[in-house]
Curated annotation (Swiss-Prot):
Subunit structure, as described in the record: Homodimer.
Protein name: Fe/S biogenesis protein NfuA
Cofactor(s) recorded in Swiss-Prot or TrEMBL: [4Fe-4S] cluster
GO molecular function, one term: iron ion binding
Similarity comment text for this entry: Belongs to the NfuA family.
Species per Swiss-Prot/TrEMBL record: Stenotrophomonas maltophilia (strain R551-3)
TM segment ranges: none
HAMAP family: Fe_S_biogen_NfuA (MF_01637)
Keyword Nucleotide-binding tagged: no
Gene coding for it: nfuA
UniProt keyword list: 4Fe-4S, Iron, Iron-sulfur, Metal-binding
């Protein structure tokens, strides 16, 4: 079930009335669902824009159309208008399932490690233009990683590995015993902090 606040409904209704297009509604869809890049998209939709398989949610003065392929990812979503900075109003969409759910305890160690790397670690490394890929997870729980992007050749890669990645994986994934770096840092082309420049 998708919840759209009265404030958000009033906001959309006013915008639609201003457009004056008969039958115009709002379409909601999930973009890249089940990935760390997942996002929700809201757009105005005229009847000719609709595919016909959308789920329709009756609102006050318009219809919210939910893309059929996105329904499962958007279940439990909340659309609202909240007070932003300097008194401005801001549209918010909270979709707790859009990025997928962490694998359960029954999932393999490899699946759980991959999920934490893709959904928690890589989004943080992306702020520096970096990433990390899981090369191997041994039966003993040793995770072998390969850095890329701005992390490959970075003078702080060892710190990132020990204080960030290893700490996160060992704290979030029972069964991980150690994390090792398999990266050829000498071949890094654009490190975030060049080796030798790290404090």
């Amino acid at each position: 079930m998708i919840q759209i606040s009265d404030t958000a409904q009033t906001h959309f209704r006013k915008l639609i009335e201003r457009e004056g297009a008969p039958g115009m509604g709002v379409r909601l869809s999930a973009v890249d669902p089940g990935t760390p890049r997942a996002d929700a998209r809201l757009e105005f939709a005229e009847p000719s824009d609709l595919l016909g398989d959308e789920w329709a949610v009756d609102c006050d003065g318009f219809t919210l159309y939910v893309d059929a392929a996105s329904v499962g990812w958007l279940d439990g979503a909340e659309i609202d208008i909240v007070a932003g900075t300097a008194g401005a109003q801001q549209l918010t969409i909270k979709a707790p399932r859009i990025k997928g759910e962490a694998p359960g305890d029954a999932a393999s160690l490899v699946e759980r490690v991959h999920w934490v790397v893709e959904n928690e670690i890589n989004p943080q490394l992306a702020s520096h233009g970096g990433k990390v890929a899981v090369q191997e997870v041994s039966a003993e729980g040793v995770v072998l990683l390969r850095f890329g992007g701005g992390c490959q050749g970075c003078g702080m890669a060892d710190v990132t590995l020990k204080q960030g990645i290893e700490k996160t994986l060992m704290g979030r994934v029972p069964g991980v015993t150690a994390v090792r770096d398999a990266t050829d840092h000498d071949s890094g082309h654009a490190p975030y902090i060049p080796r030798g420049n790290a404090a």
